[in-house]
Amino acid sequence: IFRHYDEVISGGGIIYDSDIEKITTDAVHTLDAPFKERLHKELESKNKPFTIAGVLEIAKEKGVLLYPVSFKSILLTLSEETENPRLKGLIRMYNVIGVSLSLGLVKMPPDSLQKTIESIFAKKLEIAKINQVTATYSYNYAAAKFENFDCTLPGTQKESGTLLIQGFQGTALGKMASGCRFQPYYPITPASDESVYLESNEILEIIDDRPGSTAVIQTEDEISAMGMTIGGALTGTRSATCTSGPGFALMTEMLGWAGINEVPIVITNYQRSGPSTGLPTRHGQDDLLFSVYAGAGDFPKIVYASGEIEESFYDTGNCFNYADTFQVPVIHMMDKFHASSVITCQRFEPQKISIDRGKLLENVEDGYRRFEFTEDGISPRSRLGMNNGIFWNTGDESDEQGHITEDPELRVKMMDKRMSRLDLIL
């Protein structure tokens, strides 16, 4: 309430626990000093106490409707009516009370609330029943006693073919549909949720001969995550990692290694506010130019920015196809807003994602050269362990087989070979 009371417009409403009106700003330790100082100035200028009641008085004066209710009294009443003495002490029920009071205020049909509780506590029937009883009582309390609120939220018919999804899930599902089968990562906000989601769905049934399993490994740091991603790609496996700004900064040396060795990988960068640790749980789009110029020296890469969640599912497929076709690292730009937002959209259509592995070889003849000069600058790519497909990788400039060289003419030819694919990409 201290943080958000002034965001409610005239005609809006605030439902609050009447038992907390006397709580002071000093009692809320999550209020940082700069915010508290600004709040105190606001309260002092309006001659209000430094309490919940003080900020609520300001809200009321600008036309906000206040709806006080004692959450403790609701639990006590329910405890007596259901003859369940445990209920009066279950303050965790405050969440259900708050949601139910809100839905009762806007007159939203209660069926969806009851069905949601059933779904969440499907395996805990007793807990589900307690929550449903609490929800019903709280909803009816608000519907009967909260007055003068003009906003209502009538029920709507559920549309067929729709999907409720969070941003990181859209990208993760895009990776599954695109044939990504290996994702090492190091935990970082807000990127970790994608890998955790992939890990929780590691084993999927085979549909239309397209296996759906993705191996997810938590590494010791971002450098290792990038190295393992590259290693996975060298085996011919579609491989990706995900991170945020500080983690991506650590990955840039290995990004250059992938660039000089023409390794197709996808890095999903869930941007947040920097620099350094910056604001780790807040939205930002700070890394675009950094991603474009990431890594020492010049080498081709693709930076692909998604505009919204639904788009990101299909964009992920494009990222993998571009990586394989042009044999370059692809940096898929997302952000905290996309990662955390929840939307309803049309159900994704995985069949719209095609898989193009580019010049990935199934068989290799004698005399294979991994970095062979070709007309389009893109060389046929073998996998680790293929018969006759031996090649060398180093971080140095190399000849067509991968052996280190410092020959100036060969250096120019190799640079031209790599950079020429930018014309194909564009």
Where are these regions (language model features)?
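Conserved thiamine diphosphate
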Residues: 59-69, 282-331, 355-363, 418
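Short, glycine-/Ser/Thr-/acidic-enriched flexible segments
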Residues: 1, 20-21, 72, 188-190, ...
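Short acidic, glycine/serine/threonine-rich loops at helix termini
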Residues: 5-7, 25-30, 78-81, 116, ...
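Short beta-strand segments
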Residues: 15-17, 67-70, 243, 266-270, ...
